[in-house]
Amino acid sequence: MNTIHATAIIDPGVTLGDKVTIGPYTVIEDDVEIGEGTRIGPHVHIASGARIGSACRIHAGAVLATEPQDLKYAGEKTQLIVGDRTVIRECVTLNRGTKASGRTVVGSDTLVMSYVHAGHDCVIGNHVVIANSVQFGGHCEVGDYAVIGGLTGVHQFVRIGRYSMVGGIARASLDVPPFVMAGGHASFRYEGLNSLGLKRRGFTAEKISMIKDVYRIIFQSGLLLSNALEKVRTDFPAEPEIVEILRFFDSGTHGRKFLRPFNS
């Protein structure tokens, strides 16, 4: 049985799972699907095209799946997809996709804190923590278990790799590879390996040491990036983490540059 406040406005075209709670003055448009056990607070607006998973919590004032802020958008039918058990705090805005990809995605078990904005076609992974007032341009990608500090601006098309941590009040204009820390406002830089985060997630000391050695070659050897990557391919076994790092650097798009070392 669902619990819907008398002042909420729910379009007949909305599909609700069981045990959904909807608070006062919330508006949910047609072509929306909301999974079992999701709780939606007061004054929330969920526009057409939203697909919300099970056991999510959506807090007061959040605005989800509204039209993308893109001059090329011409009314195409697109989506915002949110996974299971994700928490969306107060006044978050998540735009739906454009025809470029058709959807904006936020994964499962992710925490999106207050006043975060994610633009069209962003893909945010699982178990991600996004602190207050982070602002994503369109087409950004965030890997699983990444952490992004508050008040950070993430430029359109920037990719942030898995298990990475971006410091607060940063100007994230460069791609951030997996497993590292990055930060800086005037100059966005590599700040070392996210060793503590990796340890907390069960990475062994040997694995952490190997990843650190890889990034020492990439960022601190003085080699050109292409030569550094070739040295990594030659000197290290094809462990999954090494393959992931190399694939990240090999798959850069839109001319986006990578992080630079902190002493450059």
Swiss-Prot record:
UniProt keyword Hydrolase present: no
E.C. number: 2.3.1.129
Coiled coil start-end: none
GO molecular-function terms, A-Z: acyl-[acyl-carrier-protein]-UDP-N-acetylglucosamine O-acyltransferase activity
A GO cellular component entry from the record: membrane
Task performed by this protein: Involved in the biosynthesis of lipid A, a phosphorylated glycolipid that anchors the lipopolysaccharide to the outer membrane of the cell.
Family: Belongs to the transferase hexapeptide repeat family. LpxA subfamily.
Record-given protein name: Acyl-[acyl-carrier-protein]--UDP-N-acetylglucosamine O-acyltransferase
Species of origin: Chlorobium phaeobacteroides (strain DSM 266 / SMG 266 / 2430)
Lineage: Bacteria, Pseudomonadati, Chlorobiota, Chlorobiia, Chlorobiales
